[in-house]
Structures are given as structure tokens and as C-alpha cells.
Amino acid sequence: MPFMRILFFGLPAGVSAVVLRGLLADGRAVAGVVVPAASVPHLLPDPVPPIARLAPPAAAPLALALGDAPAGLLGCAWAAGLPVFAARALGHAGTLAALAAARADVACMACFTRRVPPALLALPPRGFLNLHPSLLPAYRGPQPLFWQLREGAPTGATVHYLDTGLDTGDIAAQTAVPLPDGLPGPEAEQRLALAGLALLRGVLDDLAAGVVRRRPQGPGSYQPTPADADFALSAGWPARRAYNFMRGTADWGKPYPIEVNGRTEWLAAADDFTEAELDRPSVRHGRHIAIRCSPGVLYARLLRR
């Protein structure tokens, strides 16, 4: 069964490269890679055109020849000899013409941060497929893992068709992805990306065989980019939920305020949790604190203030 031509949309950093690398490992026909112009300002001329093809930096050819390409999306694409485009105006006629020249059958997206206009959505005949790290229609928005961890909700991955809304298009495939306690955020994102990649492979194979599976989303929730106040904890949470939230969002570098017995404690990091009981609201020992939760006990380090 021949592979379809794929136009890939993503970000230079993060897990976009995980998905692209997997597609290339399959031998799939990736026709090009598109990133937002705002993500690569150091590689673009001034003024920034609607779309620009990015050349590898001067030092890159030798690194690519030696098999020492950068791990990110751009390095992965250049190592594979793919054209890489930085798009500033997705609906501009010049952008549409440049991307139409790729003759893609389908577009695949992972972590792309721009809304795709209707004219571009209509370009690939098989549509746009987006990998979203939640069980849609729950947790639409730019940081779904944060909100799933904050609310102690089941985690998962969805491949859905793109439409003009925000993460609202028909679902093509979906799977739950349970995460172990204490998993750091970057590792959780990797696991979700790999689960989404497995789904995406199946959807692409089905499309190539003429099989289209899609179901509309029902009503769902949308969460915005987190603010500082969203890092606040509650002693009314289960200790496991507080621990996993802190561990999973530690790379954000934010403090975690929590009200304990009428006083605000500022936590820097989570050390552990237990299902045991504590006979008082909290116990401090130097920079360490044990906090009674509901149920369980959270063990954390206090912020130096």
C-alpha cells in the first residue's frame, strides 16, 4: 500500500520532533515541514515575508553529514533532506501557493500554535489531522496536560480532523494513556506524543486504504494558558493529585501556594506522598513540610522567601 504525501506542521521545540521522527522511520512520504514564523525569528529576514523557506545554519551541513543533527524538529527535517518553511501569514496567497506545491495528500499537526484558515484547511484533499494530548472533547486548548494534572483527570491522546474551531474537529482515533505517579512533565508529554503517533499511524494507513473513521465531538471544555494563580494547591485535594500536579508541572518553575490552617505556605517542589493520615494540618522540619490532604499526606520542600 503506497504511503500518502504528508505536509507536517509543528514547533521547533517540544514533542513535534517525536512525531515527525516516527513518520520518517516508517518510510512515509513527508513532503515538507511548516513552523510558525514567530518560533524562529533568528532565522528570518527583516521584514518577515508571509512564508520563507529555511536553510540550515552555516554549521549544520557538517553536523548533518556526521549524523550529529540537532534533536529538535528542524534538525530532524534537515537531516532527512526535507524543505522547511516558516509561515507568518497562513492565509496569504503566497503561503497557499508555496504549500500547494508540496502536493500533499494530507497534513499532520503536532503542537502547532496557529489557527489554520479555511483556505489552507482545504488544500490537502484528505484534510488536516491534529494530535492533541487529551481525551477530547475534554481539555481543549493550548496546555491540556497541565489541566489534566491539576484536576487529577484521566490522561490520553486524540487524533482529530482540524476544523475552524479550537480542537473541535471530528475525532479519528483516541486512547487513554495512564501516567505513573510523579512523572515529570516532559516525560509525560513524550508518552502522550508516542501514544498519539501510534494512533496517527493507524489513521494514515486507513486513509491510504480508503477507510475514513470520524465521529463528531460533543460539548467539551476549553482551558486557557495557565496563570500564576492556577498553580495554587488545596489541602482538600488527595495527596496523590497534589503530588502528581507538582511533579508534572515542575518545569514551569512556579511556586505552589497552599492554605494550611489559616496560613499560606509556599511550596517549591514535591518530594513524596502517602495514603497515611496526619493528626495535624502540617508538620515542618527545616525547609521540608508534611501537609495533611484529603486523603493522604503530601511531603514537599518550602520555597525560600
Segment roles from a protein language model:
Residues 1-252, 257, 285-304:
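One-carbon transfer enzymes
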Residues 263-267, 296-299:
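Short, isolated positions in well-ordered beta-strands
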Residues 269-284:
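A conserved acidic, glycine/proline-rich C-terminal tail/linker
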